Amino acid sequence: MEYQIMKADMAQDDEKHYLGHVTFTLAGHQSQYEITLFSKNGKEWDYSLNFAGDSGIEEEFLKADELLEEDDDLFDALVDAAMDSMEQ
């Protein structure tokens, strides 16, 4: 699935846990999404998906969430974009 990353950020807290956000679009979807990423060690990630801005079409949101679960390349690209923002 084609995607475009609009913005990304990542930070570490005092306990060295990672917390990041990536705003992105998916081809054929009307809305932008924001994924919030959390990891205690930078290897295993929990996430929460939301619409970025106004709510959109629920069916598209559910497809986006399913895609994140199934498409490791997409998920890894979003994590990488957030991690790369720390290095700048």
What residues fall within each predicted segment?
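Negatively charged, low-complexity tracts enriched in Asp/Glu with abundant Ser/Thr
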Residues: M1-T25
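Short beta-strand segments
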Residues: Q4, S31-I35
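Beta-strand elements of well-folded, non-transmembrane domains
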Residues: D9, L26-Q30, S39-N41
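Acidic, low-complexity intrinsically disordered segments
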Residues: T36-Q88
